[in-house]
Amino acid sequence: MSKTGGSDSKNTLYCSFCGKSQHEVRKLIAGPTVFICDECVELCMDIIREESKSSLVKSRDGIPTPKEIRKVLDDYVIGQDHAKKVLSVAVHNHYKRLNHATKHGDVELAKSNILLIGPTGSGKTLLAQTLARILDVPFTMADATTLTEAGYVGEDVENIILKLLQAADYNVERAQRGIVYIDEIDKISRKSDNPSITRDVSGEGVQQALLKIMEGTVASVPPQGGRKHPQQEFLQVDTTNILFICGGAFAGLDKIISSRSKGSTSIGFQAKVAPPEDRRPGEVFREVEPEDLLKYGLIPEFIGRLPVLATLGDLDEEALKKILSEPKNALVKQYQRLFEMENVDLTIHEEALGAIARKAIERKTGARGLRSIMESILLDTMFDLPGLEGVEEVVISREVVEQSARPLYIYADRVGDAGASA
């Protein structure tokens, strides 16, 4: 019998699609006269996901509706409902503006760049990355702390456009419809409320340099990267239609907002003294006004280039537990896939997920700190596992997280902890 599906004389079963035997794959699912392996099932799911994404992008002249954008964001980002709504509307309007720019010449629609304000690890970068994936447009990230004014040691602002061009495979037209995410934008705030008499090449100077490309200019980009020199030929990239999303943790901004909102209520004998601020920074951020950003150190022109403002809140224990297990690319699913490659099942108890979430909250690292916690918990197991035989399952309990206890190893013929010999 052919080995493209069914079984042979030795009763070995084969996948009807790829022809692999039951010994070469992890799972073989039986149907009426056919079999399909887990690898082919995953391949089919990938094809369906890609086709679904393509049909989403192609709908309505290539512009997904805000609800469609929000739905995909929900698959990858837990919580932050208000920020997702603001971003969905802003991005939809931005690309609608691009598609209809040539159809209506009477009213010129201004570009609406976006400012994301939220604590470390609250999902700012992930939101921007997911938006670019949904829209199938070139995407690049830049760290504001590495940027300096042209002519100084550091990275030129125009290098951001070069990175976007590289992400678009040097297709200038595609790059001009891309998305740029600038992280740590709060780190380029002016060092004091008063204009500096000395050159601030990594603060206000960078804000001034970013103004032009964010508003719209034709940037001369050296295709080889690095500093410009007269012998190079430059590529001309119009930044007018590039969407800029800036994000930052803005440490200390909550105190500026609180002091403004309290005002002068505590002056005089008859005044009511406001209670001490006991809200989390993420809650206070919702009340941010342009004047607060001005006091923080952003210059007025820069604030004006970021008209859409979305604030992200602190992630609580329940949200962090969901982040660990629910999104399509959740951390737990990633580690389970790694263990599957060793033909071992990884089980993490619900209480263990809660303990991991509490550790991240204690460290004040948000979702960003979850991976390092998972790595430290699973390090010894991942070190030992490839050399062990007969292990079918590894179980992580709350004690493993909180008390550094050994994980439970379940063998094909017995049960033992990580200290047991193979």
UniProtKB/Swiss-Prot annotation:
GO cellular component, one term: HslUV protease complex
Stored SMART domains: AAA (SM00382), ClpB_D2-small (SM01086), zf-C4_ClpX (SM00994)
GO molecular function, one term: protein dimerization activity
Residues at which Zn(2+) binds: 15, 18, 37, 40
Keywords: ATP-binding, Chaperone, Metal-binding, Nucleotide-binding, Zinc
Keyword Metal-binding set for record: yes
Quaternary organization: Component of the ClpX-ClpP complex. Forms a hexameric ring that, in the presence of ATP, binds to fourteen ClpP subunits assembled into a disk-like structure with a central cavity, resembling the structure of eukaryotic proteasomes.
Similarity section: Belongs to the ClpX chaperone family.
Xref: NCBIfam families: clpX, PRK05342.1
Protein name: ATP-dependent Clp protease ATP-binding subunit ClpX
Organism: Xanthobacter autotrophicus (strain ATCC BAA-1158 / Py2)
Encoding gene (name): clpX
